[in-house]
Every structure is written in structure tokens, then in C-alpha cells.
A protein has these predicted regions:
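GST-like fold's C-terminal all-alpha helical module
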Residues: 79-173
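Acidic/histidine-enriched, glycine/proline-rich intrinsically disordered or flexible terminal extensions
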Residues: 177-182
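Residue-level detector of family-conserved "landmark" positions at structurally sensitive sites
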Residues: 12, 45, 153, 174-175
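GST-like domain detector, emphasizing the conserved glutathione-binding G-site
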Residues: 1-111, 115, 122
């Protein structure tokens, strides 16, 4: 979102195992990402994204109409619950040596089942870049590192990734650690 809105920002990579005490005081859940903007500290990725959309309204990443905005928020919620939560399980169990094959298969299957939706428009269910794309693209970027392999039937998703991973704003949004993921 910050790159899409061309906002200058200082990004600090934080190891969750070494969560800074100063951040822990402001974020009782010790989750990432955290946004610090002057005296304001926000956590929870959805809240951070919506704050950035309101703080930096141009270019808009949410539609102008309340019904369309609500539908987009619902999509973001589903992406979080259906896909991002699975990715979190995979990451945490990979570190702990747990078996994540079933979660990987479920995530791949769920993504593949909606692959046709990626073929209809340039962006995900939209003609323009939106917060939904900002929510979804980082997850798709991380799939190889999560050990999630999509089948050929997911071609519309591969095409979507090919279109957006090369965008200047997407590339600008990647940290050095993220660049090494692919």
C-alpha cells in the first residue's frame, strides 16, 4: 500500500522471537506488521491498510461507494481467514518441525478452486488496483517459501502473479528478505 501510494517509509524487519520491548508495550498481541506514525502505533494488517487508505487517499485503493467498500472488506476478511491464516500455520509449524502437508494441500486446493476469478479482470475482481490486491499479492509471493505448489489449473493465478510481480510498485514494496524468497 505504501508503495502504491508512493509514501516514503522506513521499514524495519523484526524477528518475532526477539520482539522489541518498546513495541510490546504498544502492541499487547506482539503481532506483525506494526505501523508507527508519529505517536500512533497500529497493529493488525487490516487496520493498518485501512488507516493508510484514509491517511493517504490518493490513489484510492477502495471504491467510493459504501456497498462496494464493504464487499472489498469482506473479501479481505475471507483472504485472511481462508488463506493467510493457513500460511501462518505453515510458517509456525515449519519452524517447529511440524507436518504441514495437509495445510499446504488445503491452501493450494482453495486457491485453485477460485482460479477462474483471476481471469476475468486485470486485478482481482476489479479493473483497478485495490486493497484486496495489496492483501493478496504478498501471500502469493510467499507460496514457494511455504512449499505450496499450485497445479496447472491455477493458470489464471500464475498470469495474475506474472502481471503484478513485475510492477514497479510491487517490487518497491519488497524488503531485502522478501526479494530472496523467489
Amino acid at each position: 500500500v505504501l508503495a502504491e501510494k508512493q509514501v516514503d517509509v522506513e521499514v524495519k524487519d523484526i524477528d518475532p522471537a526477539k520482539y522489541p520491548a518498546a513495541l510490546a508495550d504498544a502492541n499487547p498481541y506482539r503481532t506483525l506488521p506494526v505501523l508507527q506514525d508519529r505517536d500512533l502505533v497500529l497493529y493488525d494488517s487490516t487496520i493498518v491498510l485501512e488507516y493508510l487508505e484514509e491517511r493517504y487517499p490518493h490513489p484510492p485503493l477502495l471504491p467510493a461507494y459504501p456497498v462496494a467498500r464493504a464487499q472489498m472488506r469482506l473479501l479481505m476478511h475471507r483472504i485472511q481467514k481462508d488463506w493467510c491464516d493457513s500460511a501462518d500455520v505453515i510458517m509456525s509449524q515449519q519452524k517447529g518441525g511440524g507436518d504441514v502437508q495437509q495445510v499446504r494441500r488445503q491452501l493450494a486446493s482453495s486457491l485453485t478452486s477460485v482460479a477462474p476469478l483471476f481471469a476475468d479482470k486485470k486485478f482481482f475482481l476489479n479493473e483497478e488496483m485495490s486493497l484486496v490486491d495489496c492483501y493478496l499479492l504478498p501471500l502469493l509471493w510467499r507460496l514457494p517459501g511455504l512449499g505450496v505448489e499450485l497445479p496447472r489449473q491455477a493458470k489464471p493465478i500464475f498470469d495474475y502473479m506474472d502481471r503484478h510481480f513485475v510492477r514497479d510498485t510491487f517490487q518497491a514494496s519488497l524488503s531485502p528478505v522478501e526479494r530472496e524468497m523467489r
